[in-house]
């Protein structure tokens, strides 16, 4: 059949494929996500022979690559929000990469796609070659082995279709024969009528004959048979009209019977396919249900590693999981700190404590005016009682310690001012502020610092410090650059106590610029201490049982980056009271049995 022939020959002719040159090799520096501790690190990346490899640096390529992936089946995904980032995934392995700028990223993506295309998996020419082979095999076999084995009645259907094709040819021949017969008959009748009309016209001029009764008749009957002989059309003497009609009826009956059989076979095939379709739909329903269950279980598991789960407004981790991760990390740090404190013996340097007069002077450094302004603001506003203020919320109360918070947000970033009051027996304000300000003992009581150093010493009572805090995943690591000043504020009257204050506030310095590793936080913190002395009995000397230190601690912190508000407030509520208790206990421990420092 013509249709079958055209189907068999489809796909046998193709345009010759154009050969393209080999893909261009590429190498350069990209930032690669290493892990949640070290974050993004610059790596030397080489694209060659359908393989992407990376080295620690260009100088260390001779030592071998640190990792490589084949790009044949890799999936390259540009990030939705970060214009410089793109991800490459092969099965369960995912590389997170960042370029210098969007144009640089697009160049890398194009080069990787070219290597992937030339590998054969992503090539259109490869797909065309495979498709042509399938078409040729299908054309040679007529029907695929799968379809013929799936339905054995398919042979009967094809046979019936062939029979219908034969019936069609027979019917066409019969119709042509009958049509020819009718055309010849019509031509013969037309010629006969034309001849009769001509003879009648010629006889109109003949004289009539007289009959015995006096009537006149035309004398034309004598030649009637000669004039109008019986005409038989030429070319139809060999046609059996009756036989052709019977055959025509039989052919149409055969076509109807074959059509009926084909319809019956197609109905049976449809029923079989419907059963298969129902089974496949049931399988699909089960698979979708299993997929939903697997995704639900996956969401319950903790997520680690990828930068998509870091802190930020586009983080894939929700607030509850974010808080759980932060809390778990803080608990681990506390356990490590407790273990290290119990195992090691602290080394203490005999730091001479200057007299109070050394900290009473204002100084002459370039930040003198700023320090004086900060000190006066804290002395004016920080010592005010906020217990009855509706804007301040009492979030923690443990014995003498009370912690207040005022909720403030700016551009989605939590900037809650915090204020805590406490009363500690056996220590003076000078001692508390000295231990809080001194960098020699900072690591003894501060457990959140990873490292710190003094950037510049401005005066005996003022220094600039740069410190990096330990990272708490999934939050980004923070660093702080601040000026720390300690001051003694003399009492205005004899009944007023002396006040010691340590003021820490953020500044800028050329020796500690911003870096990509940490988020720079801004702080304004003050530790304000006043010493109250109860007179001893009799003529006894003042002991530590007679002194009480009233502490006011205020903190205004800008975290420098986005994090869930509920998480920040929950962590602050947990960590600030813990810090005050740990620090005051440390001061009590270090001053016990030593002379009182007023």
UniProtKB/Swiss-Prot annotation:
SMART domains attached here?
PH, START
Asked if the keyword Transit peptide belongs to this entry, the reply reads no
Quick one: where's region Disordered? 1-24, 202-221
| Molecular-function GO terms, alphabetical | ceramide transfer activity; phosphatidylinositol-4-phosphate binding
Q: Which residues carry this modification: Phosphoserine?
A: 126, 132, 135, 315
Record keywords, A-Z: Coiled coil, Cytoplasm, Endoplasmic reticulum, Golgi apparatus, Lipid transport, Phosphoprotein, Transport
Q: Where does an N-acylsphing-4-enine bind?
A: 446, 467, 504, 553
Per the annotation, the residue ranges of the short sequence motif FFAT are: 321-327
Q: Where is the PH domain?
A: 23-117
| Bias type Polar residues, positions | 1-11
* Coiled-coil region list: 268-301
Compartments annotated for it: namely: Cytoplasm; Golgi apparatus; Endoplasmic reticulum
Any one Gene Ontology cellular component term annotated for this protein = cytosol
The UniProt entry, under Gene3D superfamilies, shows:
3.30.530.20, Pleckstrin-homology domain (PH domain)/Phosphotyrosine-binding domain (PTB)
Q: Which domain of life is it from?
A: Eukaryota
Describe its function: Shelters ceramides and diacylglycerol lipids inside its START domain and mediates the intracellular trafficking of ceramides and diacylglycerol lipids in a non-vesicular manner.
* Protein name in the entry: Ceramide transfer protein
Q: What gene is this protein a product of?
A: CERT1
């Amino acid at each position: 059949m013509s249709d079958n022939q055209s189907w068999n020959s489809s796909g046998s002719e193709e345009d010759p494929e154009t050969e393209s040159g080999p893909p261009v090799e590429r190498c350069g520096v990209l930032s690669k996500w290493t892990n949640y501790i070290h974050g993004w690190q610059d790596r030397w990346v080489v694209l060659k022979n359908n393989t992407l490899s990376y080295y620690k640096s260009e100088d260390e390529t001779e030592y071998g690559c640190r990792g490589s992936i084949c790009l044949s089946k890799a999936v390259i995904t540009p990030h939705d929000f970060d214009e410089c980032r793109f991800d490459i995934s092969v099965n369960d392995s995912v590389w997170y990469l960042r370029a210098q700028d969007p144009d640089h990223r697009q160049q890398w993506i194009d080069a990787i796609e070219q290597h992937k295309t030339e590998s054969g998996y992503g090539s259109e020419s490869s797909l065309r070659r495979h498709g042509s082979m399938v078409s040729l095999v299908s054309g040679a076999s007529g029907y695929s082995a799968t379809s013929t084995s799936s339905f054995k009645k398919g042979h009967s259907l094809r046979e019936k279709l062939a029979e219908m094709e034969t019936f069609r040819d027979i019917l066409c021949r019969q119709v042509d024969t009958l049509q020819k017969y009718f055309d010849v008959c019509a031509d013969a009748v037309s010629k006969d009528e034309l001849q009769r009309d001509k003879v009648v016209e010629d006889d109109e001029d003949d004289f009539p004959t007289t009959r015995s009764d006096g009537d006149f008749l035309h004398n034309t009957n004598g030649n009637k048979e000669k004039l109008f002989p019986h005409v038989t059309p030429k070319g139809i003497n060999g046609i059996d009209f009756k036989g052709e009609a019977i055959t025509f009826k039989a052919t149409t009956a055969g076509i109807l019977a074959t059509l009926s059989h084909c319809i019956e076979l197609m109905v049976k095939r449809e029923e079989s396919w419907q059963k298969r379709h129902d089974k496949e739909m049931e399988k699909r329903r089960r698979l979708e249900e299993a997929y939903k269950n697997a995704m639900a279980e996956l969401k319950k598991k903790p997520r680690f590693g990828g930068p998509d789960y870091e802190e930020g407004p586009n983080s894939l981790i929700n607030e509850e999981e974010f808080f759980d991760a932060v809390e778990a990390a803080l608990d681990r740090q506390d356990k490590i700190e407790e273990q290290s404190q119990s195992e090691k013996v602290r080394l203490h340097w005999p730091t001479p404590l200057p007299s109070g007069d050394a900290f009473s002077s204002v100084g002459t450094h370039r930040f003198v005016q700023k320090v004086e302004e900060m000190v006066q603001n804290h002395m004016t506003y920080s010592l005010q009682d906020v217990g009855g203020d509706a804007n301040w919320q009492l979030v923690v109360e443990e014995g003498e310690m009370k912690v207040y918070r005022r909720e403030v947000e700016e551009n989605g970033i939590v900037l809650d001012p915090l204020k805590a009051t406490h009363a500690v027996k056996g220590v003076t304000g000078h001692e508390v502020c000295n231990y809080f300000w001194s960098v020699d003992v900072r690591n003894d009581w501060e457990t959140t610092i990873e490292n710190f150093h003094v950037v510049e010493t401005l005066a005996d009572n003022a220094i600039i410090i740069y410190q990096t805090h330990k990272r708490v995943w999934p939050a980004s690591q923070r660093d702080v650059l601040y000026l720390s000043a300690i001051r003694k504020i003399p009492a205005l009257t004899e009944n007023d106590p002396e006040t010691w204050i340590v003021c820490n506030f953020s500044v800028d310095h050329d020796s500690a610029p911003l870096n990509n590793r940490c988020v720079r936080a801004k702080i304004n913190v003050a530790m304000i201490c006043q010493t109250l002395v109860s007179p001893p009995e009799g003529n006894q000397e003042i002991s530590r049982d007679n002194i009480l230190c009233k502490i006011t601690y205020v903190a205004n912190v800008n975290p420098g980056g986005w994090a869930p508000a509920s998480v920040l407030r929950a962590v602050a509520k947990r960590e600030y009271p813990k810090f005050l208790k740990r620090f005051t206990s440390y001061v009590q421990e270090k001053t016990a049995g030593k002379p009182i420092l007023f």
